[in-house]
Amino acid sequence: MSAVLGRYRTSEAMWERMRPLIPKPVDHHPLGCHRPRVEDRRAMDAILFVLRTGCQWNALNATGICSSSAAHRRFQEWTQAGVFWQMWCAGLMEYDELKGIDWEWLSGDGAMNKAPLAGEKTGPNPTDRAKSGTKRSLLVDGRGAALGLAVSGANVNDFKLLRETIESIPVDRPRPTRQRLQNVCLDKGYDYDEARELLAEFGFTAHIRSRGEEARLLARRARYRARRWVCERTHSWLNRFRGVLIRWCKKPENYVALLHLALTCVNHAVAGLSG
């Protein structure tokens, strides 16, 4: 147990940020006689273990962290209460206070992942022989901190998720001005008039590479790197969390909750915070 907890346990710094967001439990037993409730810290350690390793919930019984039923039940309770979304919001606000969100250059992109159990917001993956898959759409700031998230089936075009991704930004966004434009860098998957009109509607300045344009730039400048590389890096960081690398959750709200927890960890790392 100590070896497992030593590697995957929630750090003290992160737990101190999470603890105020966890709701107090309500005792529904008429006599108050029931088994002792597993500590919130141990339940969070178990959830983080599942997120990092991608193991089945039932495998938690072998780790000694806590029982699989207790961890999964607590995960469902906190998902319904919006705890993981609040953690993501609180992490973004703290990041904004410490470093300031870089609104000048934003980047967006989508990434597809396998979803063997299917469920809502999944679809045939065109890059995986039409097997069941899911797509996550991210909007990040200039340093790679995730500001927006949307989930859909793998067969949905990236630009179709742009509105939902922008509208999911949980923090107050400053108003763009002529002196301080808010630029959004996107790849050729967003090369549609609908995407440009949508960005203009929200006050963003669009920078969308047309089909073939980036290939020509790379041919002339071998070391050329698009500004949106920070978004691709954030997707890569998310894939290190094996619990979201392959979507085993049939319910989309459970998958989104795991993504919010993973993004909380990513944003803390971008902010230079321990844990």
What are these regions (language model features)?
Residues 1-275:
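Short alpha-helical elements
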